[in-house]
Amino acid sequence: MKIRASVRKICENCRLIRRRRRIMVVCSNPKHKQRQG
């Protein structure tokens, strides 16, 4: 899980979702997991 100021899709499998007022990226590749902090 990477915590970044700006999250974006890295590949075509990445999905932007909102969870508990946070923008997150979930993907089939675990390296692409991100959270806005």
UniProtKB/Swiss-Prot annotation:
Gene Ontology biological process terms, A to Z: translation
Q: Does the keyword Plastid apply?
A: yes
- The disulfides recorded in the entry are none
Chloroplast as a keyword of this entry, yes or no, is yes
Q: Which SUPFAM superfamilies match?
A: Ribosomal protein L36
Cite the Pfam families for this sequence. Answer: Ribosomal_L36 (PF00444)
Which InterPro entries does the UniProt record give? Ribosomal_bL36 (IPR000473), Ribosomal_bL36_sp (IPR035977)
Q: Which PANTHER family match?
A: 50S RIBOSOMAL PROTEIN L36, CHLOROPLASTIC, LARGE RIBOSOMAL SUBUNIT PROTEIN BL36C
Listed NCBIfam families? rpmJ_bact
Q: What is this protein called?
A: Large ribosomal subunit protein bL36c
Question: Which gene name does the record give?
Answer: rpl36
